[in-house]
Amino acid sequence: MAPDVDLDAVAASTPGMVGADLANLVNEAALLAARRGHDQVGTADFADALEKIVLGSVRGIMLSREERERTAYHESGHALLGMLTPGADPVRKVSIIPRGRALGVTFQAPDTDRYGYSEQYLRGRIVGALGGRAAEEIVYSDVTTGAESDLDQVTSIARQMVGRWGMSDAVGPIAVLPPPGQESPLGLDGVAPATRELVDLEVRRIVDECHDEALATLTAHREQLDRLAHALLAKETLDEDEAYAAAEVPRDEAPGVLARGDVPGILPDPGAPPRADAVVAGS
């Protein structure tokens, strides 16, 4: 391992990862170093390996000018709300390089591991996930299919808030829905139709409120949205410092940045147990 590798920095960038995840990271970094002809695994190898694991492999496709610009605004919407929403995880990287199934990605991760969930945090997750769609609405007065995975995440979080975590006054502090992935295929789970309808109404209310918040925040900070999108178009990928600088949001003063020890929770992927404390939004 090269002397420039800061293991504390590596640990800080991998909250929630278990031993197998870290072993995979080290192996991937070693493979990258070997391909590059390096005798030692360096900081850049670790950074690129983490990016590949978390964000996915780069896809060799060429976007049109219009699609590239729209993707930049979509990701800037996610990122700017991550910076401005109280309690949100810090934005670590924003990119408009196509990876996996996404045309762009915004990566957020907390400074420490998280194991609990607060309603404020979960609402912030929904607001941030709706940021890409909201940015498209503001800039283009139209939306695309790029928000598909965002809407899946939004719906899952809101349904669990209402049906499992007691975060709806109308439904009350009871768990009326089964855990994700354990639903009865015939709907024979003992939940009355009227209760299901109430859950649906509350889910829609929460999502609508968060959507309104996303639109209002991005509209109020339109100049910052434009600056961030233009920086993305110029560089394609922005790291944490570059993203906050482009948006002119002081990193240490951003309302989305929590002090250490003041972390309310991390939501796992829909249907999966908690693993890595990271939020990835893509278009």
For every predicted segment, state its role.
Residues M1-A47, K52, G56, I61-M62, ...:
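Conserved C-terminal "switch" segment of AAA+ ATPases
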Residues D4-D8, N27, E75, D226, ...:
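A generic alpha-helix surface/boundary motif
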Residues V5-D6, D21, D45, E67, ...:
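Single-residue recognition of alpha-helix capping/boundary positions
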Residues D21, G77-H78:
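Short hydrophobic/aromatic residue motifs in ordered secondary structure
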Residues I61-T71:
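Short pre-active-site segment immediately N-terminal to the catalytic Zn-binding motif
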Residues R70-Y73, A79-S283:
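Soluble catalytic regions of large protease machineries
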